[in-house]
């Protein structure tokens, strides 16, 4: 993509309403625009990041055996009355009446609808286990939306729902999602810690929140620092095998949100030099809620003995749009964003330091064409902005690699390759720069 043809509305001044780093940088970098309180338009740069995060989530859900579908944003109020949650959910739910006086709601979550789909088609235990997920926009009418995408009213979420014949099978499904989440966040360059948590309006008696430690987080957390060094399962993890050792390794080290924190256990089990009492950002949460919804909504299957039994369920959420902000909170410096490579809007930026010079123009064009042909997402800054401005823009938007092309370097057959993560620089030939980015 040529920057001269890309829509990138950089802001020179930070909007006053932006209270935290991620909100400030997303607005300044032209990633989004606020349209109403807690509601944002995603501009091209932000959308590229959002789509890459969404794809990682999708790949790891598929790897763990979940099956993608897509449910509508609007749901019938009667479904929620059937489960008993319509009146219990509170003012965060956006309630709508259509022209025929039918009561609808803009879905804040989908347990009722997925249960209705399940009971319409699944009759036997032989069709279990089943895990269905979708990635869809949701709305919760937060009383005080703030912090940009971290606490907005409209947000993109992945929610998965598992169905099993009994509790033992349901806990296996829970474990699959637990491991899938570890892998998902690690691929995004995040250290997300699974912590025991309250179940809230979803219900059930087992839940873990996946928390990224950050002082700007909304959750108070307590953990043993050893949890930061635990290994994340690799590509060879067998989701059909026994995942219990992985789960035990991650849950035997103390980690809990403030809502379920056990002060006595924390004091007793965690050495003083390993105690962490800080704040964190919730990027995902998983629940096992047993037969809470299947009992009320009659989601039954015939068991091995032919007797109908309610299925055991779980739900598993990832805040896809919130992750954009969480990654920025974890990956930035005073100059801007430092995207991990897997979620960056572009992998490399070519900076033409003397636009209009025949030599630099030709070298940049050659690099741009070769990298593009080899499948590298590259942004070519072919604007007439001064070199200092180009450096500032590239740092602000956080492209992992910058190829600086100027007349002095080209005179020696070199370009400068800069790594945004650590600021390291190296003089290499154009061919070496291409090789570095394609191997």
Curated annotation (Swiss-Prot):
Which keywords label this protein?
Aminoacyl-tRNA synthetase, ATP-binding, Cytoplasm, Ligase, Nucleotide-binding, Protein biosynthesis
> Subcellular location, in the record's words?
Cytoplasm
Q: Which InterPro entries does the annotation name? A: aa-tRNA-synt_IIb, aa-tRNA-synth_II, aa-tRNA-synth_II/BPL/LPL, Anticodon-bd, Anticodon-bd_dom_sf, Pro-tRNA-ligase_IIa, Pro-tRNA-synth_IIa_bac-type, Pro-tRNA_synthetase
Q: Which GO terms describe its biological process?
A: prolyl-tRNA aminoacylation
Cellular component, GO annotation: cytosol
Q: Which CDD domains match?
A: ProRS_anticodon_short (cd00861), ProRS_core_prok (cd00779)
An example of a GO molecular function for this protein is: ATP binding
Annotated membrane-spanning segments are none
Q: Which reaction does it catalyse?
A: tRNA(Pro) + L-proline + ATP = L-prolyl-tRNA(Pro) + AMP + diphosphate
> Does the entry feature the keyword Cell membrane, yes or no?
no
The UniProt record lists the EC number as: 6.1.1.15
Q: How does it assemble?
A: Homodimer.
PANTHER family in the cross-refs: MITOCHONDRIAL RIBOSOME PROTEIN L39/PROLYL-TRNA LIGASE FAMILY MEMBER, PROLINE--TRNA LIGASE
Q: Could you tell me what this protein does?
A: Catalyzes the attachment of proline to tRNA(Pro) in a two-step reaction: proline is first activated by ATP to form Pro-AMP and then transferred to the acceptor end of tRNA(Pro).
The similarity comment for this entry is: Belongs to the class-II aminoacyl-tRNA synthetase family. ProS type 2 subfamily.
State the protein's name: Proline--tRNA ligase
Q: From which source organism is this entry?
A: Rhodopseudomonas palustris (strain BisB18)
Query: Which gene carries the instructions for this protein?
Result: proS
């Amino acid at each position: 993509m040529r920057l001269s043809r890309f829509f990138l509305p950089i802001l020179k001044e930070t909007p006053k309403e932006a209270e935290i780093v991620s909100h400030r940088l997303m607005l300044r970098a032209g990633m989004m625009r606020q349209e109403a309180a807690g509601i944002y338009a995603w501009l091209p740069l932000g959308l590229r990041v959002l789509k890459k995060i969404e794809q990682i989530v999708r790949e790891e859900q598929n790897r763990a055996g979940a099956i993608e579908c897509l449910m509508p944003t609007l749901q019938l109020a009667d479904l929620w009355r059937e489960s008993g949650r319509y009146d219990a959910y509170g003012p965060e739910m956006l309630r709508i009446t259509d022209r025929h006086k039918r009561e609808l709601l803009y879905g804040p979550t989908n347990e009722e609808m997925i249960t209705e789909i399940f009971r319409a088609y699944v009759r036997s235990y032989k069709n279990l286990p089943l895990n269905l997920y979708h990635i869809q926009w949701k709305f919760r009418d937060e009383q005080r939306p703030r912090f940009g995408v971290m606490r907005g009213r409209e947000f993109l979420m992945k929610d998965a729902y598992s169905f099993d014949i009994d509790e033992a099978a349901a806990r296996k499904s829970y474990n699959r999602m637990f491991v899938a989440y570890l892998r998902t966040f690690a691929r995004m360059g995040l250290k997300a810690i699974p912590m025991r948590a309250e179940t809230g309006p979803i219900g059930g008696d087992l839940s873990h929140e996946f928390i990224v430690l950050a002082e700007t987080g909304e959750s108070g957390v307590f953990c043993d620092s050893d949890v930061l060094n635990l290994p994340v399962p690799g590509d060879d993890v067998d989701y059909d095998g026994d995942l219990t050792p992985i789960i035990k390794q991650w849950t035997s080290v103390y980690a809990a949100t403030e809502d379920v924190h056990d002060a006595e256990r924390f004091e007793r089990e965690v050495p003083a030099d390993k105690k962490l009492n800080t704040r964190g950002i919730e990027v995902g949460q998983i629940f096992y809620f047993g037969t809470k919804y299947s009992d009320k909504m009659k989601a039954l299957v015939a068991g091995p003995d032919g007797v109908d039994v309610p299925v055991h369920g779980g739900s598993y959420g990832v805040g896809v749009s919130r992750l954009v902000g969480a990654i920025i909170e974890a990956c930035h410096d005073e100059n801007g964003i430092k995207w991990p490579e897997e979620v960056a809007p572009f992998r490399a930026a070519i900076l033409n330091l003397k636009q209009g010079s025949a030599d630099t123009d030709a070298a940049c064009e050659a690099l741009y064409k070769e990298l593009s042909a080899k499948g590298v997402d590259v942004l070519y800054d072919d604007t007439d902005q001064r070199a200092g401005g180009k450096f500032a823009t590239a740092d602000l938007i956080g492209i992992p690699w910058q190829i600086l092309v100027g007349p002095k370097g080209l005179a020696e057959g070199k370009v400068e390759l800069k790594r945004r993560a650590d600021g390291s620089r190296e003089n290499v030939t154009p061919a070496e720069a291409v090789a570095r980015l394609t191997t």
